[in-house]
A protein has these predicted regions:
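Periplasmic/ER-lumenal interhelical loops and adjacent helix-loop junctions
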Residues: 1-71, 78-79, 85-93, 98-107, ...
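Short periplasmic/luminal acceptor-recognition loop of GT-C membrane glycosyltransferases, typified by
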Residues: 201, 229-230
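Contiguous transmembrane helix-bundle modules in multi-pass membrane proteins
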Residues: 73-81, 85-87, 96-223
Length: 230
């Protein structure tokens, strides 16, 4: 079946080399960070700014068993190692390097992070809001540091400024949830904000994909189908 893909079968080299720098991976956690689906691309691990805020809260929430938190941290570390070590990454892809669309198991890491963020959100009222403020401040510093690296695929406005805005907005929204004021409405507002962020990120990713590999027009597809229709 590989004969009909983007390239033919190739000899796989199981070398223990590092695939990317850790800061590169961190940048991919933010919205508007589309780079490429080509072989040199990084993992697609964006799953919402609110997830990045709640993830550290998961590890400092005493209501969650320490054994669960410890094992979750171990699994996160294992995924990061699998992404970054070439030989292990190839094993995940059936012992054959993928033709484009790298790290096809990244959805598993995203699912784990979402579950952890949900648990942290569920126990947010028992947390210390100062920790949320600290996490938001840390994310802001990380974003400024990422901006300084001048990645071609990290735009000032479409990624850095958008992410900073999301950090600030979600930081305020989580305070209303934490304080219990307008709790029902506050949770609904958080859900709406998440939807707006995801729509914006999806739109930016679609634009980035079109610039990267070009999304075929409907006319070109329709012309092809007319040739093969009976």
């Amino acid at each position: 079946s590989l004969q009909f893909g983007k390239s033919t079968f190739s000899t796989t080299h199981y070398t223990f080399t590092q695939r990317f720098d850790f800061l590169d991976f961190t940048a991919k956690l933010f919205p508007g960070s589309y780079d490429t689906v080509r072989p040199e691309g990084l993992p697609f691990v964006y799953c919402g700014v609110i997830t990045l805020i709640l993830l550290p809260m998961y590890f400092v929430t005493s209501r969650i068993r320490w054994q669960e938190r410890m094992m979750s941290g171990v699994i996160l570390a294992v995924f990061l190692i699998c992404f970054n070590v070439n030989a292990i990454d190839i094993v995940w892809h059936g012992f054959q390097k993928p033709n484009w669309l790298n790290y096809r198991y990244s959805f598993m890491l995203i699912f784990l992070m979402l579950v952890m963020a949900y648990k942290a959100f569920s126990y947010l009222e028992y947390a210390n809001y100062k920790n949320v403020v600290f996490v938001c401040g840390s994310l802001a510093v990380i974003l400024m540091f990422i901006q300084k690296q001048d990645y071609e695929w990290v735009g000032d406005f479409r990624c850095v400024w958008l992410s900073l805005l999301c950090v600030a907005v979600f930081g305020v929204a989580l305070w209303f949830v934490y304080s219990g004021k307008f709790k029902g409405r506050a949770t609904a507002i958080v859900a709406i904000l998440v939807c707006i962020e995801l729509f914006t990120s999806g739109l930016l990713n679609t634009i980035g994909l079109d610039k990267d590999v070009v999304i075929s027009s409907r006319n070109s597809y329709d012309n092809y189908m007319q040739k093969v229709r009976p």
